[in-house]
Design a protein with these regions (language model features):
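Phosphopantetheine-dependent thiolation modules in NRPS/PKS and related acyl-activating systems
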Residues: 2-49, 54-83
Length: 83
């Protein structure tokens, strides 16, 4: 995946996450963890992952379902798009 595609995925994930949890996209850092830093409950995180289906992202893929922080999710989604 080229750098532009990675940036597009990162922007998509961060924008959707910001909209979902009600924060400004600039407040979301790559290293933020979903449960601790972004204060998402496991149910909220699960719902967020399920909502990624509208972007044709498979939320049940192991790398996506097991992501603990924003950058892990971005990398997992990026690798899924390449496959």
């Amino acid at each position: 995946m080229n750098e532009d595609s990675y940036i597009n995925v990162a922007n998509l994930i961060k924008r959707h996450l910001a909209e979902t949890i009600g924060v400004d996209v600039d407040d979301i850092k790559d290293e933020d963890t979903f449960l601790e830093d972004l204060h998402m409950s496991p149910a909220e995180f699960s719902d967020f992952l399920a909502s990624l289906e509208k972007f044709k992202i498979d939320p049940s893929a192991p790398d996506i379902a097991n992501a603990n922080c924003v950058v892990e999710l971005i990398e997992a989604v990026s690798s899924q798009i390449v496959e």
